[in-house]
């Protein structure tokens, strides 16, 4: 039998005897509309929901709907803000607390909280940091909203950028790029879908890497520790890797049985 894993939210809801509902879609969903209307709630808080809240739902609570969005709005509206921030080598990442309006991520913002982005941070680590930050800040935010103390300021829509959904094929590395951009891509796509290269028809996913000091032709393997040359007389050193169909490995263990050796050329396609 397949076991269905409960989400942490479902688990805590059941423990505390709080209603837990999981509608696949809210659009034209009369049941959920009437459920929420009957609750007569003060405020709705939305985090990483992945669907547009229909306009008719937005009037069902006294103080509207607010969203915790994982970017410094108006930058990186949309589906993959954390990944795009890391890929873009942004100096800061953050969360924005905004009122939900009909257009996606366009509502006025009451507060933005930032953290410095270290360029060895991956998407999983940043997601965890921002989740903790959001959990810490939202309680005061809710109090301010309920007491009419929160000030929501319109976004500058002319400065908006969009964090489009990640496509798996974006993970393929281009050795004609510079080292910082390659590391940014590796970190932004960990753990999913992962940055990768193809060698002799097999896919190798890079889980962790750092900037190296070697110089060579783009795609050339410069050492038996899997240091690979890229553009601008730069290189990256791979620290953890996963061969297609295999478990993740530290690079020392991986290289013992690998057909990738010093002098191998890894192409872009």
Show the residue positions of the predicted features.
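An anion-binding loop in the catalytic cleft
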Residues: 176-269
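One-carbon transfer enzymes
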Residues: 1-191, 234, 243-245, 262-269
């Amino acid at each position: 039998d397949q076991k269905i894993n409960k989400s942490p939210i479902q688990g805590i809801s059941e423990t505390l005897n709080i209603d837990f509902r999981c509608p696949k879609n809210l659009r034209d969903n009369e049941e959920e509309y009437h459920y929420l209307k009957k609750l007569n709630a003060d405020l709705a808080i939305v985090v990483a929901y992945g669907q547009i809240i229909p306009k008719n739902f937005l009037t069902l609570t006294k103080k509207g709907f607010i969203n915790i969005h994982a970017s410094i709005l108006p930058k990186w509206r949309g589906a993959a803000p954390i990944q795009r921030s890391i890929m873009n080598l942004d100096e800061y990442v953050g969360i924005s607390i905004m009122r939900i309006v009909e257009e996606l991520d366009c509502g006025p913002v009451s507060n933005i909280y930032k953290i410095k982005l270290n360029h060895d941070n991956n998407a999983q680590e940043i997601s965890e940091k921002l989740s903790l930050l959001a959990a810490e800040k939202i309680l005061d935010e809710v109090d301010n909203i309920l007491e009419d103390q929160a000030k929501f300021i319109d976004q500058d829509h002319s400065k908006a950028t969009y964090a489009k959904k990640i496509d798996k094929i974006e993970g393929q590395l281009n050795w004609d790029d510079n080292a910082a951009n390659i590391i940014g891509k590796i970190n932004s796509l960990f753990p999913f879908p992962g940055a990768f290269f193809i060698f002799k028809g097999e896919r190798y996913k890079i889980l962790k890497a750092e900037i190296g000091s070697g110089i060579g032709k783009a795609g050339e393997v410069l050492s038996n520790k899997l240091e690979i040359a890229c553009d601008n007389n730069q290189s990256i050193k791979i620290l953890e890797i996963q061969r297609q169909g295999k478990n993740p490995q530290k690079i020392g263990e991986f290289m013992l049985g690998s057909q990738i050796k010093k002098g191998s050329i890894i192409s872009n396609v």
